[in-house]
């Protein structure tokens, strides 16, 4: 099956159709030709497959101290949470390496429950763990899940996201990490079991039990609801690490009540309550989660419970400037590529942190605040070859004055208009 060009009688690659003049080398086989470009492409595909196989042997799982050190590069504060996560993740993958049984001792899964306010770093911690271990990672929102047979997503769709993250390599997906956000939203609506169906609360908790513990799940490859005439992807969830996170708004009074403090009324220990308010979440116990609305079986599948603290002003400033992927560093690098030096005054950073605290969005709100400040700067400066430096002041953050622009000769650019708040 020789391939010839009809016009010049030249040999062609049997795979891509390029002629011998269009490639550097054409290798002949029995009845076929292959060019150097196709050989290179095939080699890359094979190497990628072999690389993936080696990648998931987990022979060199980082030690807890090493995991914590890498987390410190990306996540500010939350020292106790980092320590708990590092130990839990290390034990989980050590269990996988050992085959989950050592001398007739069965090692159980160490799924994790993270409790902390919005924007405290729950999702970022889970994402960073997956990056450290180089495993497939998927995020699911518990609020979109419903019990099988009702409008909404089946719990198996969570597993589909992980399979997709692993490029449909089921073996890789079986050693991945799934982060389920807003897990507190599937709490039972009442402490007492209801007569009516709670399809997005207790029903979802019941549906999640099996996959959290470890089962062979049947996942519809295209997502959506199952129907009898479709093929399923079979995946074993035994070695998938599940990390669940939620704000658990309203659990503090439950913890206070257990600790014997009065929630309201005369004679309440106000001073003591104020002192302990910040550390209240760290005292959470499984019995508090039970009263909040999680069922006992579900709590039992999440043996590692860790709490995150609300971020204070200084922590938010550190988040803006210190991590490897800090947003201020990113903007500095982007403007540096245009030949402009970017500087944020200390007072400006403090004002940004205050705004995030006022909005009660934690670290998540920092990006939207900075993007609002930087929009005009990023729009105009690439066209301004005369500007050497841009300084963001506290007045810029408050919307009173535009950023201070300095020319190459050291003179300040005079602005005729104000930027929007």
From Swiss-Prot:
Positions bound to Zn(2+): 13, 16, 35, 38
Residues bound to ATP: 117-124
One Gene Ontology MF term: zinc ion binding
Chaperone is among the record's keywords: yes
InterPro entries registered for this protein in UniProt: AAA+_ATPase, ATP-dep_Clp_protease_ClpX, ATPase_AAA_core, Clp_ATPase_C, Clp_protease_ATP-bd_su_ClpX, ClpX_bact, P-loop_NTPase, Znf_CppX_C4
Pfam families: AAA_2, ClpB_D2-small, zf-C4_ClpX
Record-annotated ClpX-type ZB domain positions: 1-54
GO cellular component annotations of the record: HslUV protease complex
This protein's record includes keyword Protease: no
Keywords of this entry: ATP-binding, Chaperone, Metal-binding, Nucleotide-binding, Zinc
GO BP of this protein: cell division; proteolysis involved in protein catabolic process
Role this protein plays: ATP-dependent specificity component of the Clp protease. It directs the protease to specific substrates. Can perform chaperone functions in the absence of ClpP.
Similarity annotation: Belongs to the ClpX chaperone family.
PANTHER family: ATP-DEPENDENT CLP PROTEASE ATP-BINDING SUBUNIT CLPX-LIKE, MITOCHONDRIAL, ATP-DEPENDENT CLP PROTEASE ATP-BINDING SUBUNIT CLPX-LIKE, MITOCHONDRIAL-RELATED
Self-association state and partner proteins as the record states: Component of the ClpX-ClpP complex. Forms a hexameric ring that, in the presence of ATP, binds to fourteen ClpP subunits assembled into a disk-like structure with a central cavity, resembling the structure of eukaryotic proteasomes.
Name of the protein this chain belongs to: ATP-dependent Clp protease ATP-binding subunit ClpX
């Amino acid at each position: 099956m020789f391939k010839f060009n009809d016009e010049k009688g030249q040999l062609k690659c049997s795979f891509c159709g390029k002629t011998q003049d269009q490639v550097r080398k054409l290798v002949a086989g029995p009845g076929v030709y292959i060019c150097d470009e196709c050989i290179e492409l095939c080699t890359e595909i094979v190497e990628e497959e072999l690389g993936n196989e080696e990648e998931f042997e987990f022979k060199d799982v980082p030690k807890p101290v090493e995991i914590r050190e890498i987390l410190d590069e990306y996540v500010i504060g939350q020292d106790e949470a980092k320590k708990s996560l590092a130990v839990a993740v290390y034990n989980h993958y050590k269990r996988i390496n050992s085959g989950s049984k050592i001398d007739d001792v069965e090692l159980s899964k160490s799924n994790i429950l993270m409790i902390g306010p919005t924007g405290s770093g729950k999702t970022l911690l889970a994402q960073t763990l997956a990056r450290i271990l180089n495993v497939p990672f998927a995020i699911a929102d518990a609020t979109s899940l419903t019990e099988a047979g009702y409008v909404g997503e089946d719990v198996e769709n969570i597993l589909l996201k992980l399979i997709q993250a692993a490029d449909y390599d089921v073996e890789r997906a079986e050693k991945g990490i799934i982060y389920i956000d807003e897990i507190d939203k599937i709490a039972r609506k009442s402490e007492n079991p209801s007569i009516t169906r709670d399809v997005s609360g207790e029903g979802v908790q019941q549906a999640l039990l099996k996959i959290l513990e470890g089962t062979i799940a049947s996942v519809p490859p295209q997502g959506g609801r199952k129907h009898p005439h479709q093929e399923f992807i079979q995946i074993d969830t035994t070695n998938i690490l599940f990390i669940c996170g939620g704000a658990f708004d309203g659990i503090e009074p439950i913890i206070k009540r257990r600790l014997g403090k009065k929630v309201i009324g005369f004679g309440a220990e106000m001073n003591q309550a104020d002192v302990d308010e910040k550390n209240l979440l760290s005292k959470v116990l499984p019995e508090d989660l039970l009263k909040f609305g999680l069922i006992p079986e579900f709590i039992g599948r999440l043996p590692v419970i860790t709490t995150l603290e609300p971020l204070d002003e200084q922590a938010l400033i550190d988040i803006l400037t210190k991590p490897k992927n800090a947003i201020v560093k990113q903007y500095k690098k982007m403007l540096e590529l245009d030949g402009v030096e970017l500087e944020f005054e200390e007072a400006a950073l403090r004002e940004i942190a205050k705004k995030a605290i006022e909005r009660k969005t934690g670290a998540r709100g920092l990006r939207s605040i900075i993007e609002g400040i930087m929009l005009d700067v990023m729009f105009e400066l690439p066209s301004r070859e005369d500007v050497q430096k841009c300084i963001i002041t506290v007045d810029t953050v408050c919307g009173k004055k535009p950023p201070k622009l300095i020319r190459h000769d050291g003179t300040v650019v005079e602005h005729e208009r104000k930027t929007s708040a």
